[in-house]
Design a protein with these regions (language model features):
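Active-site catalytic microenvironments in core metabolic enzymes, especially phosphate/sugar-handling
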Residues: 1-228
Length: 228
């Protein structure tokens, strides 16, 4: 890549690499604050998340975190990761879009999301917004962004607590089968907006803040869309 493209001053990875990946569990406390914001008692959110955070930490420990970092060093290409800030941006962006559109049923949630260029592009290659729990005519109830930011998936037990707090629909980037089944048990609808497409929105919102004249070369699943 360094030889072919030339003049690449910086490689930005969205997903964490190096010590950022090794410490991914450190950002998961953010989910406690988010769940409290959506009405889950903070003591319950904290107890459930602390257990999950330890599980994630153990899962990360054997990984080869420095592989990409070492390759960048050998090629003399600066490398940085920007994960949670971008996820925070897309969570806010999608939440504001849905608040404005005020969908009443899940079909309308999908329609609202598909108006966003990154999701529209993802739709063309078969990975657009999808319903993982619930039918198109199901009412949304209270919509929460509990599966967008916070490092990685939280505790599977949290869906019942979200339901108890009045949540009706969860918007996420991705969801494991175990988590999906727990959401289904709690009678919570799950809309999966898409992973790389959601990441692309967050990265695009950040890239749009770069000063004019900075050339951006999209790759590795990044869908570039300029908003200003």
């Amino acid at each position: 890549m360094s030889d072919k493209l030339g003049d690449i001053d910086l490689v930005i990875s969205h997903h964490p690499r190096g010590k950022a990946l090794a410490g991914l569990d450190d950002v998961m406390d953010l989910q406690i604050d988010m769940l409290e914001h959506y009405g889950v008692p903070v003591n319950i959110a904290e107890k459930l998340l602390k257990k999950r955070i330890k599980e994630v930490s153990r899962g990360l420990s054997p990984g080869n975190h420095q592989r990409a970092v070492d390759m960048a060093r050998l090629l003399d290409v600066p490398l940085m990761s920007i994960h949670t800030p971008c996820d925070n941006l897309v969570a806010k962006f999608v939440e504001e879009k849905l608040e404005k559109d005020n969908p009443r049923i899940l079909k309308e949630v999908l329609e609202s999301l598909r108006e966003i260029p990154e999701y529209r592009e993802a739709e063309k290659v078969g990975v657009g917004p999808k319903l993982f729990v619930g039918g198109k005519k199901n009412r949304t109830g209270k919509i929460v962004m509990s599966e967008i930011t916070g490092g990685t998936e939280g505790a599977p037990e949290i869906y019942q607590k979200l339901a108890d707090a009045g949540a009706g629909t969860v918007i996420g980037m991705h969801i494991s089968e175990k988590h999906r089944k727990e959401a289904q048990k709690a009678h919570i609808n799950v809309v999966i907006a898409g992973h790389m497409s959601s990441d692309s929105i967050g990265v695009n919102l950040l890239m749009d803040k770069l000063k004019e004249g900075v050339e951006i070369v999209p790759c590795s699943g990044f869908i570039r869309n300029k908003r200003n």
